[in-house]
Design a protein with these regions (language model features):
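N-terminal, polar/charged subdomain of small-to-medium soluble alpha/beta proteins
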Residues: 1-94, 99-114
Length: 114
């Protein structure tokens, strides 16, 4: 069985709560997630905002990365989205959520995808 996957790259703000909630499955005892957030510093320098761009192949590459974990029988759903464009401090840049039968499996998959 291969897990359901939902991936994307968007310039729209990410609704992290909805994306994470969309990973839930009745067959799973765990949903592990990661939210990458724009911080106010990098390398000792202040940051006021960040500009993300993506290569045209980025959606396919993200899907390929996620697919590596989708074939694991204990993973049932993977959601992975990345934001591009102008992001302010505190905005979500990346959301990954994995529904798996057990927490250790979900955490391992999230870590591998990120």
């Amino acid at each position: 069985m291969s897990a359901e996957i939902a991936t994307g790259i968007t310039d729209d703000p990410l609704d992290s709560s909805s994306l994470i909630d969309s990973a839930r499955r009745d067959t799973c005892g765990a949903v592990a997630s990661f939210i990458g957030v724009v911080r106010n510093h990098d390398g000792g320098e202040s940051v006021e905002a960040i500009e993300y761009s993506s290569h045209p192949s980025s959606p396919q590459i993200l899907r390929e990365i996620v697919s590596e974990f989708a074939d694991r029988p204990w993973v049932h759903r993977i959601v992975a989205w990345h934001r591009v464009g102008h992001l302010e401090i505190g905005e979500d840049a990346m959301v990954v959520a994995v529904a798996a039968e057990h927490r250790a499996q979900a955490f391992r998959a999230v870590e591998g995808i990120v």
